Swiss-Prot record:
Lineage, highest ranks first: Eukaryota, Metazoa, Chordata, Craniata, Vertebrata
InterPro entries the record matches: UPF0574
Start and end residues of each stretch annotated as Disordered: 1-89
Cellular compartments annotated: Cornified envelope
The family this protein is said to belong to: Belongs to the CYSRT1 family.
One Pfam family, short name: DUF2477
Known role: Component of the stratum corneum that may contribute to epidermal antimicrobial host defenses.
Entry's Gene Ontology BP terms: biological process involved in interaction with symbiont; establishment of skin barrier
Subunit text: Interacts with components of the late cornfied envelope (LCE).
GO molecular function, one term: identical protein binding
Native species: Bos taurus (Bovine)
The protein's name in its UniProt record: Cysteine-rich tail protein 1
Gene Ontology CC: one annotated term: cornified envelope
Length: 126
């Protein structure tokens, strides 16, 4: 081992520069508020569909009324039906878990299956 290496491991370790000083325009953007779609929270009521009335009567599987028609995704139909999870879904990026379904709602405001993460009201995963 080099004797100089034991004395000076990192010559810049004593320098501390806050990130705002490195890019001052970021500090100004932060004060002005979020401007990108990624930093804005999702609107809670983004569905255009009206809430379904909860009719008392016999319940099917998973507590849903037994008389409802099969699940119809709101998208272009590329995703297969049944992508709702019984528990929290995997949290990796790119997981196909945003199955937006209007006929088997978990809450009255967005009509999505449980743990779909389409809206903030359905986000159970931290």
């Amino acid at each position: 081992m080099d004797p100089h290496e034991t004395l000076v491991k990192n010559p810049y370790a004593h320098i501390s520069i806050p990130r705002a000083h490195l890019r001052p325009e970021l500090g100004q953007q932060r004060k002005a508020g979020p401007s990108s779609a990624e930093s804005r929270p999702l609107p809670v009521r983004s569905c255009t569909l009206e809430p379904l009335e909860e009719a008392p009567g016999p319940k099917g599987t998973k507590g849903r009324p037994a008389s409802q028609q099969p699940c119809k995704p709101c998208g272009s139909g590329q995703r297969p039906a049944g992508l709702a999870y019984a528990g929290p879904p995997p949290a990796q990026r790119g997981d196909d878990i945003a199955h937006h379904c209007w006929c088997c709602p978990c809450c009255s405001c967005c009509h999505c299956p449980r743990f779909c993460r389409c809206h903030s009201c359905c986000c159970v995963v931290s």
